[in-house]
């Protein structure tokens, strides 16, 4: 986890064949990132384009000084100016909120519990659970705890990730003022044909603004992203609040 945290920008950008661009290469994208970064009072990150028709975007990097924002060719084709600004605001918010660090800490915590659970599981099998009758009850309890604890840790890790997505959505609206535009962008990305979904790797799916690996029902407990419908609903409420506060001010 520490290795992936330190070298995440290089690893993920290479994984998706992202190409760093300059303002001359793609003025629209570069200037949008520049504008939002200035509004957030952050250093300018690397700006990259992923050669994929699947509409998606992500931010990576261990801190604001070593960050990168990448968007796919497909995203640039289907979003208008305001929607693009809303999406970039979401990614800049992840950088501002230090979500790579928080995600690394959560993953490390879950990994440590998984290791301890494995040790306890083998201890229960070869120790208490396999010993005398009066030890079997305690050994069985230890075995159950060893199985449940890592599962609970992963669920908590995913819940933290979902909350960070909500926070990044809200921060994007605060930075850019584009609550409605981000909501319509999420709707467009969600409705993209299945054939256009980005070939996501599970290890990096949590970085994307739209996770095509998310599940439904009980499997949603293991999803890194909240349901799109709930994200849009929250953005619409925040937009209404911003209007009311504007009138009240």
Where are these regions (language model features)?
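Polar-ligand-bearing catalytic/cofactor-coordination segments
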Residues: 1-140, 152-249
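Hydrophobic alpha-helical transmembrane segments of integral membrane proteins
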Residues: 142, 146-147
């Amino acid at each position: 986890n520490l290795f992936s945290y330190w070298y995440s920008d290089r690893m993920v950008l290479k994984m998706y064949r992202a190409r760093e661009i300059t303002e001359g290469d793609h003025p629209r994208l570069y200037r949008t990132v520049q504008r939002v970064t200035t509004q957030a009072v952050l250093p300018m990150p690397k700006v990259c384009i992923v050669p994929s028709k699947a509409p998606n975007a992500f931010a990576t990097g261990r801190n604001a000084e070593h960050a990168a924002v990448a968007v796919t060719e497909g995203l640039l084709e289907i979003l208008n100016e305001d929607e693009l600004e809303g999406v970039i605001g979401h990614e800049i918010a992840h950088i501002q909120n230090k979500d790579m660090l928080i995600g690394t800490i959560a993953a490390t915590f879950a990994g440590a519990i998984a290791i301890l659970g494995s040790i306890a599981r083998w201890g229960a099998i070869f120790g208490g659970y396999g010993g005398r009758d009066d030890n079997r009850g305690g050994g069985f309890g230890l075995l159950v705890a060893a199985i449940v604890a890592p599962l609970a840790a992963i669920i908590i890790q995913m819940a933290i990730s979902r909350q960070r997505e909500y926070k990044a959505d809200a921060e994007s609206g605060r930075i850019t003022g584009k609550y409605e535009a981000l909501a319509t962008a999420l709707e467009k990305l969600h409705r993209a044909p299945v054939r256009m979904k980005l070939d996501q790797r599970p290890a990096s799916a949590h970085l994307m603004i739209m996770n095509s690996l998310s599940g439904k029902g009980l499997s949603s407990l293991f999803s890194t992203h909240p349901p799109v419908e709930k994200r849009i609903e929250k953005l619409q409420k925040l937009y209404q609040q911003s209007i009311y506060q504007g009138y009240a001010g």
